[in-house]
Every structure is written in structure tokens, then in C-alpha cells.
Amino acid sequence: MTLLLRLFTLGCLLLLAGCATTQPQRDQVNWQQERTRLEQLSHWQLSGKMAIITAQQKGSARVNWQQDGDDYRLNLTSLIGTHILELSRSKGEITLIDNEGNPHQSQDAEALIYQLTGWNIPVAGLPEWIKGLPGQAEFELNPDRSLASVRDGQWQIVYGDYRDQDGYRLPHLLTMTGQGSRLKLQINQWTITR
């Protein structure tokens, strides 16, 4: 009887050890599945607040971003509602409307924002980074398989406060550091439009 009990205990321990060793593989598969789902998410909106800190200035803005496939519209307003800028990409054309209502066009959204505001905002990477995707950059995962951080060229992105939204697990806090700037994006609301 004692031998049978020992064999049963040993079998249970081996079974548990086997489950523990397969966990990282299952996590990796789940990350790949979630990554594929997020890559297919191309129509969404968000609203929140952004703090912008450089050596020369500190600022904050309300953020409204609408993504429609490859096209987007980014509105930044002051905390009291004053228009700062509206940046849009439509059919490959980038237009920025400044705080006086003047339109500016360029092929480089980041350079255009910097020229008019002095802010380095990595617009090219934001549609992916905002959703918790690393693009082609180096990245690290949290234990729960959400994106922890991304290093993309001169930018380091650190993620936090993931929440479930319409079947997706989306970040609500991003801290982006690079090009002499630190941006902190607090997302208050996600809307999945398709």
C-alpha cells in the first residue's frame, strides 16, 4: 500500500512538472495569436491625455486619435480645450492644421510637428505602438504575455495598465522616451470601430 501511495505521489509530481515546463511554449503561442489579432485591428479611436517633456519645455494636451486603415486623424487640444494642432493622413497626404487654422503639408509628419511645435512625437510608430504592437522592433513581454517594452531606433516605449476592450487587451498607459523627449500617454477610452 505504501509503495502504491508513493508511486501515485511521484506520478502527480511528474504530471505537475510536465505542465510547468510546457507553460512558456503556450504563452508564446498566445502572444503570437494576440499579435496577429492586433495587427488586423485597423479601425479604432482613442481619447486621453499626453504629457510632453523636453529640455526646453513641458506641456500637456488632450489627445483624440482616429485610425481608419492607413489613414489617421490626430487632434491635440489644451486641457482647457484650445486647439493646438490637427494632423491627418489621407491617401498618403499628410496635413497639419496649426493653432491658427493654417494648413501645412509634408511627407514627414514628425518633422512637420517638430517644426511647428518643437515637440518630437514619433507619429510613424504610434499606430502600432498604441495598440501594444512592437512592429519590427526589439521587444519584451510581461508575464501575462502583454507587451512590456519596445526599443525602436531612438525610441524606448514602456507599457502599463492593460485593460480588456471589445475582446482585445489594450494598453492604457505608454511612456515613450527618445530624441531628447519624454511623452506619457494616458488613454482614457478606446473605441473599436470595425
Curated annotation (Swiss-Prot):
Pfam families: LolB
Entry membrane topology: Lipid-anchor
GO cellular component: cell outer membrane
SUPFAM superfamilies: Prokaryotic lipoproteins and lipoprotein localization factors (SSF89392)
Matching InterPro entries: LolA/LolB/LppX, OM_lipoprot_LolB
Compartments in which it is found: Cell outer membrane
Quaternary structure annotation from Swiss-Prot or TrEMBL: Monomer.
Protein name: Outer-membrane lipoprotein LolB
Source species: Aeromonas hydrophila subsp. hydrophila (strain ATCC 7966 / DSM 30187 / BCRC 13018 / CCUG 14551 / JCM 1027 / KCTC 2358 / NCIMB 9240 / NCTC 8049)
Source lineage: Bacteria, Pseudomonadati, Pseudomonadota, Gammaproteobacteria, Aeromonadales
